Amino acid sequence: MDTQAFKRSLHHSDRYNRRGFESPTKRAQALEKAYQSNLIGSIRDNGYLFEHGRLRVKLAEAFGFCWGVERAVAMAYETRRHYPKESIWITNEIIHNPSVNDHLRNMNVRFISAEKGIKNFSSVQEGDVVILPAFGATVQEMKLLHERGCHIIDTTCPWVSKVWHTVEKHKKHEFTSIIHGKVKHEETLATSSFAGTYLVVLDLEEAQYVANYILGKGDREEFLKRFSKASSQGFDPDRDLQRLGVANQTTMLKSETEEIGRLFEKTMLRKYGPAELTEHFLAFNTICDATEERQDAMFSLVDEPLDLLVVIGGFNSSNTTHLQEIAISRGIRSFHIDTPERIGDQENTITHKPLGDDLITEKNFLPEGNISVGITSGASTPDRVVEHVIHKLINLSEEKAFVD
């Protein structure tokens, strides 16, 4: 499919909207009323520091809702106001935050059901309104909805759209797109649908495996088996790894994406020499500013003298998971929670998700004596949720009893 031609056609349709329905001022006011926090605002004004009794809280200097998330959430809410009686669907979670998605359900916005990763659009009818989430949607989904006569409200983050343009550029010039991302993540699924030939690598280890193969140090059958679900149809590593362009899922760890880019540039330089490098490797810049800012702020936060660190965000949120990885890399006790309710009301307990593991409940997670707690949150977490977490910590810090 000529994805660029399809997008041009879609964007000119009177059933497609990517600008929303309300003025930026009204949109900001509605979002502020729903999610902003006076407490968090005052903590920002106080150098991101809050102290109460024996509790000292240090916030990361960049956290929470990014511009792309704010835009997507606001557009989703105003869509219901604009279409008060119509059937409204959304192709996936608007963002990876349970409270925001629950609010949409309460507004009678229905989520497209999926079984084993396959979405069922059979209930969506002509004239229905369908919201595309901040992560975007695959070009095949857009085409299906457009041909069915749906009204499409596109809240895709512009940074994600930028990555789509990058992989389309790769396709136009017959380069294979190496996509640094999680193969089942909604954003990576959407990005790969706009690519031509592509290969998804999860991390530096997988990228090194691919680089070794390029340099003649791999087994073809093993390669094909390893990337059978992470490559374009008919992918041939002997044919398709000769001309490479790099792109990424915008929420991946910035430093790792940059390292992967350098690895493939050096690999192609080694194989083809400096005179032919530009014929075999395309430089890239698809790292999201907001992701970069939050990760940089996290690196600064972990340099603080902290007893523990709380990372707030959806358990399926890629950008939140990478913030947790930074804390772990520094050996700091850290707890990834998705809602304030994971912290006990009176008992000194926290139910959290260790990296790559299931939920566990830890007793006596707040130590005795003075406590220094670092807090950050993913790009899909409202300030009001962070405020509720701080109130939970205040209450527990005032409690005397520890759990046996």
Curated annotation (Swiss-Prot):
The lineage of its organism: Bacteria, Bacillati, Cyanobacteriota, Cyanophyceae, Synechococcales. The keyword Transferase does not apply. Isopentenyl diphosphate binds at residues 96, 185, 317-319, 380. This is 4-hydroxy-3-methylbut-2-enyl diphosphate reductase. HAMAP family: IspH (MF_00191). Belongs to the IspH family. GO terms for molecular function: 4 iron, 4 sulfur cluster binding; 4-hydroxy-3-methylbut-2-enyl diphosphate reductase activity; metal ion binding. Keywords: 4Fe-4S, Iron, Iron-sulfur, Isoprene biosynthesis, Metal-binding, Oxidoreductase. It is an enzyme of class 1 (oxidoreductase). (2E)-4-hydroxy-3-methylbut-2-enyl diphosphate binds at residues 96, 185, 250, 317-319, 380. Its cofactor is [4Fe-4S] cluster. It catalyses: isopentenyl diphosphate + 2 oxidized [2Fe-2S]-[ferredoxin] + H2O = (2E)-4-hydroxy-3-methylbut-2-enyl diphosphate + 2 reduced [2Fe-2S]-[ferredoxin] + 2 H(+); dimethylallyl diphosphate + 2 oxidized [2Fe-2S]-[ferredoxin] + H2O = (2E)-4-hydroxy-3-methylbut-2-enyl diphosphate + 2 reduced [2Fe-2S]-[ferredoxin] + 2 H(+). Binds 1 [4Fe-4S] cluster per subunit. One of its GO terms (biological process) is dimethylallyl diphosphate biosynthetic process. Dimethylallyl diphosphate binds at residues 96, 185, 317-319, 380. The active site is at residue 187. InterPro entries: LytB/IspH. [4Fe-4S] cluster binds at residues 66, 157, 288. Its EC number is 1.17.7.4. The keyword 4Fe-4S applies. Pathway: Isoprenoid biosynthesis; dimethylallyl diphosphate biosynthesis; dimethylallyl diphosphate from (2E)-4-hydroxy-3-methylbutenyl diphosphate: step 1/1; Isoprenoid biosynthesis; isopentenyl diphosphate biosynthesis via DXP pathway; isopentenyl diphosphate from 1-deoxy-D-xylulose 5-phosphate: step 6/6.
